Amino acid sequence: MDGLRQRFERFLEQRNLATEALGALEAKTGVDKRYLATGAATLLSLYLLFGYGAPLLCSLIGFAYPAYASIKAIESPSKEDDTVWLTYWVVYGLFGLAEFFSDLLLSWFPFYYAGKCAFLLFCMAPGPWNGAHMLYHRIIRPLFLKHHEAVDSIVSDISGRALDVAAGMTKDAGKVSVNQLQKAK
């Protein structure tokens, strides 16, 4: 528990948008920013558990900060932060795909959105206990390496067929257009 408290304290010492807002609120109210941050986290948690807009809030948490951090990573000269956020987006995408098929059932479970939000926060957590990194290296990457050649072959075949169909449709549309123009004259 002390490790979590120390990380929380270190977070509050960093200079970022959240800590600046907490500092301004602390100056106006006289309430310590640790209590303000704890209160905000508690309200957020309660809203995720019982609030009407929990799906939207959870989606914003899972998308807004990672999108911002991804843009910062793209603009930075380092490749390592790019890899961190690409890994997150791979896991996020696969989670979204799995959720598409199970959401109707899972959304009826109590505290589903709180659990989903906790999972997404786990996936974007900094440091060695980053959930996206763990899931990618333990599950996704081994499956990818095992099956990527077969998937590449299927995708190549499908894209070739799609191009053939599109070319045929374009030809047919051109013929129909020419015929219609000739009939109109």
UniProtKB/Swiss-Prot annotation:
InterPro entries with a match to the protein in the record: TB2_DP1_HVA22 (IPR004345)
Predominant subcellular localization, coarse grouping: endoplasmic reticulum
Keyword Membrane carried by entry: yes
Keyword Transmembrane attributed: yes
Membrane topology label: Multi-pass membrane protein
GO biological process, one term: detection of light stimulus involved in visual perception
Summary of the tissues where the protein is detected: Expressed in the retina (at protein level).
Subunit structure: Interacts with STX3. Interacts with clathrin.
GO CC term (a single one): endoplasmic reticulum
Subcellular compartments: Endoplasmic reticulum membrane; Cytoplasmic vesicle, Clathrin-coated vesicle membrane
Entry keyword set: Cytoplasmic vesicle, Endoplasmic reticulum, Membrane, Transmembrane, Transmembrane helix
Gene designation per UniProt: REEP6
Role this protein plays: Required for correct function and survival of retinal photoreceptors. Required for retinal development. In rod photoreceptors, facilitates stability and/or trafficking of guanylate cyclases and is required to maintain endoplasmic reticulum and mitochondrial homeostasis. May play a role in clathrin-coated intracellular vesicle trafficking of proteins from the endoplasmic reticulum to the retinal rod plasma membrane.
Name recorded for this polypeptide: Receptor expression-enhancing protein 6
Top-level division of the source organism's lineage: Eukaryota
Family: Belongs to the DP1 family.
Transmembrane segments: 43-63, 89-109
Pfam families per UniProt: TB2_DP1_HVA22
